[in-house]
Regions:
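Flexible glycine/proline-enriched surface loops and loop-helix/loop-strand junctions
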Residues: 118-120, 168-169, 181, 231-239, ...
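Bacterial N-terminal signal peptides that target proteins for export
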Residues: 1-9
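Gly/Ser-rich catalytic/binding loops embedded in alpha/beta enzyme cores
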Residues: 25-203, 221, 245, 289, ...
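Short, surface-exposed loop/helix-turn segments at secondary-structure junctions
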Residues: 125, 267-272, 399-403, 423, ...
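Structural helix-boundary/capping segments
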Residues: 60, 191-296, 301-302, 313-322, ...
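Short helix-loop capping/hinge segments that flank enzyme active sites or metal/cofactor-binding pockets
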Residues: 99-118, 280-297, 347-417, 462-481
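N-terminal signal peptide c-region/cleavage motif recognized by signal peptidases
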Residues: 18-19
Length: 520
């Protein structure tokens, strides 16, 4: 070989080795937005190497090994887009809030470059014409959309099973469900397939997978974040929000997602109520002096509730040790089982909402709920009864029962606001789910408490509280989430107390089923 050629070959090898070394210096496990940005700025990390590490983990654990089945689509241009971000950064591009942050979307968020299907075979291949509002915001903020996650089909139940994606497993106990309906996002983040993600929440669906996967899930005040460009369920109850591993990352996500959108007129109520940055409220001492109501109505008292109650008892002690004053709140009007049976309005609004969404799509596989049902291509064990009931509503929004429920929801909103105001409470606290998530095969994710926030539109955040006792199937136990609910647009205060609790406990642990890859 010519001496000059040898020199060039050696140089190429050294460059390749240096590039690989850059990626290997960075530990992707549990990495936060701030961790990634520090490493990008210091030169210890490239966007491409970061994305490659996440892709390697998806390849190793999503369909192989534990076969978690969290991902529906992986962005085929992820590495190409990451390389473009690296080149722009080298040219002096500004570091944006989500610059090079690999993000996964629940498959209800419209994306111009990937299908949006709600996990349904009936909607397979449906390609929106443009990004939804929040997806566009993410791209503007520099995020890299790594892929879209499995979910409980059409966001209509809580065990994360779909006709298109199958059953997603809980990485902490592989025979257990991961919550839902945003369970694919929850599992992807728990298993470190991405940095942050999104969910939608009609009753429990952001906070349930957060609780079940040792994550942070924020359901915002109705009107804070646009729902335009998201497959809907109920215009009264729907919200979208972040799912993350840390409270700080949830605050960054809120900064990007919150804002007025004329395509979702309810966001007009958020104008003037959004701070310059939610990260300003991340205070380790945020619980000091806080008055928090313990909503005993939402705790269980049966043997199935013992593990959750044990974790919650320890969590309440932490709140007190960090300087919070706890006030007992007992109001049977807040019983979530009763609220679900007597006030939930999904059945009356679903056909109206879904049909309007499908009409706005350029070439949908079906054009209405009736056509979707007629295909038979949906998860019948969990959806058949609800879909038939929703389709049977000939004049749903004018039905007397629906109107009566809307009046009761207004009354509930006033009652809840007063429960907080009369005792000068910054928040109410309770377990997100009274018991551990159900095992795979059960179609009912029983005894979740999310509906109080969903009906009223009040904000709530779920944070890791601890784990059940370890078992052979769950070597570190099953995650348990604590939920804080506050007055409308009190997200800053909720983030403050949630961050203080998180920093006092550091309760989150990654699952043992998806360890670091060799050499990574």
């Amino acid at each position: 070989m010519h001496p000059q050629m040898k020199i060039l070959t050696l140089a190429a090898v050294l460059i390749l080795a240096a590039a690989n070394a850059v990626g290997q210096q960075f530990q992707v496990m549990e990495a936060s937005i701030a961790d990634i940005h520090r490493s990008l700025q210091s030169g210890k990390l490239t966007c491409r190497s970061l994305v490659q590490q996440y892709l390697d983990r998806i390849n190793a654990y999503d369909q192989q090994g534990p076969a978690l089945n969290a991902m529906l689509y992986v962005n085929p241009k992820a590495l190409e887009q990451a390389e473009a971000m690296d080149q722009a950064f080298k040219r002096g591009a500004k570091l944006k809030p989500l610059q090079c942050i690999p993000l996964v979307l629940k498959d209800v968020f419209d994306t111009a470059d990937m299908p949006t299907t709600g996990g349904s075979l009936a909607l397979k291949g449906m390609q929106p014409a443009k990004d939804g509002f929040t997806v566009a915001r993410f791209r503007e903020a520099g995020a890299l959309i790594l892929g879209k996650t499995n979910m409980h089909e059409l966001a209509l139940a809580g065990v994360t099973a779909s006709s298109l994606g199958g059953q997603t497993k809980n990485p902490y106990e592989l025979t257990r469900t991961p919550g839902g309906s945003s369970g694919g996002t929850g599992v992807a983040l728990a298993a470190n397939f991405a940095t942050v993600g999104t969910g939608s929440d009609t009753v429990n669906s952001i906070r349930s997978p957060a609780s079940a996967n040792s994550l942070v899930g924020m359901r915002p005040t109705r009107g804070l974040i646009s729902r335009a460009g998201v497959i809907p369920v109920s215009f009264t109850q729907d919200a979208v929000g972040p799912i993350t591993r840390t409270v700080a990352d949830a605050a960054v996500m809120l900064d990007v997602m919150a804002g007025y959108d004329p395509d979702d007129p309810v966001t007009a109520f958020g104008v003037g109520k959004i701070p310059h940055t939610y990260t300003a409220f991340l205070d380790r001492n945020g619980l000091k002096g806080a008055r928090i109501g313990v909503l005993r109505t939402l705790f269980g008292s049966e043997p199935d509730h013992q593990e959750v109650n044990r974790v919650m008892a320890d969590a309440l002690e932490v709140l007190k040790k960090q300087g919070a004053t706890l006030v007992e709140v007992n109001d049977p009007a807040f019983d979530t089982g009763m609220l679900a049976s007597d006030l939930d309005v999904q059945k009356w609004e679903y056909k109206y909402d879904l049909n309007n969404y499908l009409k706005a799509q350029p070439n949908p596989p079906v054009h209405s709920l009736a056509e979707l049902i007629a295909t038979g291509n949906y998860h019948k064990p969990s959806l058949e009864k609800f879909l038939a009931s929703a389709e049977a509503q000939q004049n749903g929004l004018n039905e007397p029962d629906y109107k009566d429920r809307r009046v009761k929801i207004d009354d509930l909103r006033v009652r809840l606001a007063n429960a907080l105001a009369k005792d000068n409470l910054v928040a109410l606290v309770y377990p997100h789910q009274k018991r551990l998530p159900v095992m795979i095969g059960n179609m009912n994710q029983a005894e979740r408490n999310g509906i109080l926030a969903s009906l009223t539109g009040f904000p709530a955040i779920t944070v890791p509280a601890g784990f059940s006792a370890p078992t052979a199937g769950a070597p570190i136990g099953v995650p348990v989430g604590i939920e804080f609910l506050g007055q409308p647009f009190s997200e800053p205060q909720l983030l403050k107390i949630a961050y203080s609790f998180e920093q006092a406990t550091h309760a989150r642990k990654p699952p043992q089923s998806t360890p670091p890859l060799p050499g990574k």
